[in-house]
Swiss-Prot record:
Protein name: COP9 signalosome complex subunit 5
UniProt-listed SMART domains: JAB_MPN
UniProt record similarity statement: Belongs to the peptidase M67A family. CSN5 subfamily.
Claim: Protein transport is one of the keywords in the record: no
UniProt cross-references to Pfam families, sorted A to Z: CSN5_C, JAB
Length: 340
């Protein structure tokens, strides 16, 4: 059961094994990076980078850091290199920054920390450069706000190649799969061909609804996958052997209760707002009162999708709890039956 649980986690997060031949992903080639940085293919094609491969070590570090922040946003940097149209992220480290529930910014103290940390890494023979930054969006999905877009655009201007990664720790706990997204911004004078690509359906809190999608034309998303080395595989097995019982005993409905309550409160606010809007529209339509507008139908459809999403997560948590109860609650009585 322990091995199958670990395998399920790796499959959910698409963690691929890297054998000794493919452990070369961890070997930094300084000459190759200098050649790529000199050629700068991303200058000719703003959508040059299309993939991100994140090591299991970096993924765990970023997820644990995001979770430790609670309702506050946290921030860190990623180390690695580029290979063709792919970012290879080998490691990540947190930054000592002050965050709020809606934004996070690096200060002078963080800049000094970055310089010292990278110097120590190079002294130990780790030559990977900083290739991006990550931060958390507790409870409101993986996308870029206006401040995030400006931050990423500035970094791409001065130290490209660079990418932004967003992790939602609340949705990660809720689903059991790391909720992660990777993004790059377009140049200021560039308009993507084929129009604006939407961020897709996400249950975004009402307070963030106005900003969600407002800057979608300024950035694009990259496909995220994960990998592990032979050493990572051994370390993950040791960690899983230590914590797998705790994983089984936890219930996301209890662990993430505050997030669930916030979702329900936010949904009720959206329903109230949609009801007010529909009533106002019908009152202004006069004789067309019986006909609902397309915008009203769209709003109701989004609310229905969000309600179904919340209900499915709650249902999954309840079913998982019932399965664990049926598996473990009667083990003692079956193993040691008592005679009357």
């Amino acid at each position: 059961m322990e091995a199958s649980a670990l395998k399920a986690w790796e499959l959910d997060n698409n963690v691929q094994l890297v054998d000794p031949k493919r452990d070369a992903l961890y070997n930094f080639d300084a000459d190759a990076q200098k050649a790529i940085n000199k050629e700068q293919p991303w200058k000719q094609d703003p959508s040059h980078f299309k993939h991100v491969r994140i090591s299991a070590t970096a993924l765990i570090k970023m997820t644990m850091h995001a979770r430790s922040g609670g309702n506050l946003e946290v921030m860190g940097l990623m180390q690695g290199y580029t290979q063709g149209d792919t970012f290879i992220v080998t490691d990540a480290f947190r930054l000592p920054v002050e965050g709020t529930e809606t934004r996070v910014n690096a200060q002078d103290e963080a800049n000094e920390y970055i310089v010292e940390y990278l110097d120590l890494c190079r002294a130990q023979g780790r030559q990977e450069n900083v290739v991006g930054w990550y931060h958390s969006h507790p409870g409101y999905g993986c996308w870029l706000s206006g401040i995030d877009v400006d931050t990423e655009a500035m970094q791409q201007q001065f130290q490209d190649p660079f990418l932004a990664v967003v992790i939602d720790p609340d949705r990660t706990i809720n689903s059991g799969k790391v909720d992660i997204g990777a993004f790059r911004t377009y140049p200021a004078d560039y308009k993507p061909s084929g129009g604006v690509t939407s961020d897709g359906f996400q249950a975004v809190p009402l307070a963030k609804a106005a900003e969600f999608g407002a800057h979608a034309s300024r950035y694009y998303s990259l496909e995220v996958s994960h990998f592990k080395s032979s050493l990572d595989s051994h370390l993950l097995e040791l960690l899983w052997h230590k914590y797998w019982v705790q994983t089984l005993s936890q219930n996301p409905l209890i662990t993430n209760r505050d997030y669930g309550n916030k979702q329900l409160l936010d949904l009720s606010s959206k329903i109230k707002e949609a009801t007010t809007g529909i009533t106002r529209n019908r009152a202004g339509q006069g004789m067309m009162m019986g006909m609902s507008t397309k915008s009203s139908d769209k709003a109701v459809d989004k609310l229905a999708k969000e309600a179904n999403l919340i209900a499915s997560k709650e249902r999954s948590g309840l079913i998982a709890n019932q399965v664990k109860a049926s598996l473990f609650n009667d083990l003692g009585s079956k193993a040691n039956p008592t005679s009357e």
